Amino acid sequence: MKNFLISLILLLVVCTAQLWGQANTLATVTGHVVDENKEPVPGATVVITNKSTGFSSGTLTSADGEYTIRQIPLGSPYSIEVSFVGYGNQTRSNYTLNQGDVLRVDFQLSESPVVIEEVQVVANSMKKKAANIGASTSVSARDIATMPVNGRNFTSLIDLSPLSDGNNLGGQLQSSTNYTIDGMTAKSAYSTGTSNRGPYSLSMEAIREFEVVTNSYDVTMGRAGGQKGEVMKKIIKLICFVLAVSMIAVIFCGCKGSGVVLATYDGGEVLSTDDDGQRTDDPYSVSQFGVTLSGAIVKDRLHYFIAWDQQYDSRPLEIADINGPEDEDRLGIKKETLDKFLQIARDQYGVSDSPQVGSFGKKRNSTSLMARFDWQLNPTNLLTVREIFNRDMDNHGTDDNSNINLYEVYGSNLSTDNSLLATLRTIVTPYATNELKVQYLYQMDHGFPNELLPSSNIPRAIVENVESAGSLQLGGQRFLPEQFKNHTVQAVNNFYWDTDKVDYTFGADVQVQYLNSLATSEMNGRFYYNGMEAFENNTPYRYAREVPVGDPTVKQTVLNSALYAQGKLGLFKGADLTVGLRGEYTYYFSNPEENPTLKQLMDISTANKVKGFQLQPRIQFSWDINDQHTDILRIGGGIIGSA
């Protein structure tokens, strides 16, 4: 028994140190209603209303006078009204709800009506965030507006987490980081990062709040920690991470009519240096501008929000731009050596007579568009439709890993993604709420060789041991051409049921991905030359190439699904225990091809079905000591990963 307790304590300590994420994109309001004698008032009506959008939701107090309203859209100003037969109505106003807030508002009813027009903001900001203290780092829209965020990329806000080193969290792989927007997947299906390779995948003006959640054990979140690795290797990890971005429905909360914001930024003269800090006379500019529109289409019923961001990036591409002895020292190569390499390349290897080294104009154009509509269908149903479109054209932005690559080596990449999301929030009963989300996500990455080369690419020549320069390269490159297309359909349904003793959550998350991939990395072949003389005599010492078997295009259909249930029990004042179970199932519809030679010689089959199932029990204890929102103890653990 003693060893079991020690093991359990160690497990909980380890689990709380790991990275897990939750995308609680909405807020919760809870409280206690009593009468003048401080006795509970059961059956009192509690209604919360957003005075800016007209959204409203309500519930009834329990036998103990407790009430909870879940899945409330973020924004302000909110008012809360309590009414009961025989007592005057009591109203409290001017509340702001941010991502993951659990706002507690208690009422004491009297015979006379009471209206509190303004709620003072106190210095203790833990009051609403007590449920997330120690679990997340939150950045509000106001913080975002005042922070000098470079490039207006919301993912750079991850650096505000104490667990971030700029590339990962807590020392984990970047591929373990999941990204969600409005609680639905926004992660690239092929690599790390978001679904778009551009400088940003969402206008900064469209972000209500950004949250880095690293220590929570809610069953509604999963499918992280590098889902592809887990499927293939069937590894169970205790490490996951989710970035949740929740977008504002109407960004000008409390304003009448429509709102318009114009944002511009231009960097030019002061930034005119290359990557090594050397001054360049070539045109250099990074211009960003955008517009946001918001307002009511039908007052208190239908509202819209539109955000558009555009970036024009014109920074020169510097390739061995030698204009004097200082450049030779900096680059580690003499101009005569470089000229000789170019002459041989043109005379014997067919390199174009157009410039291959120097300073080249390089342009990158990026567009981000978001539109959102919130429609209060009736007092019990809120429908939200949201569209995000991104396009990034990065010309000559893909190089290879030799020390000096000629201009013809540099390829381009076009990245496009489109996300259409519909959310329906329904009040089933005064004690039950259902939220259904359905998303279609399209992602396309198309990389293609330089305009000086054939579209199918050509082999490359790598000349090594060239003085102190290391290696020089001409021809094609390892990555291009490539093309990745991903169609994702995701449906998530969460049902919240509050009882006198336990708050239940039941849900399902189903995601189907259709992947079409053409990855030609290292398939074009490469010749290695030991020095300039061998290059001139065309005597390579090595040739290497990864040869595809058949069509290199890979088509896959993947099912990722999950069922989960959770109960939250109040133990005593300020303390609660949450216990949940999540089951994840992953299935690849297409089988790998059989290798008959391997099967015959070693009786090893390569045509095995790829699938996996994983049960993930989770538990968390939270104690707000004395219910003062100043001292909070949280212990949790569980299995977290992907099937």
Predicted regions and their residues:
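Periplasmic N-terminal accessory/gating domains of Gram-negative outer-membrane beta-barrel systems
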Residues: 88, 94-106, 117-231, 258-278, ...
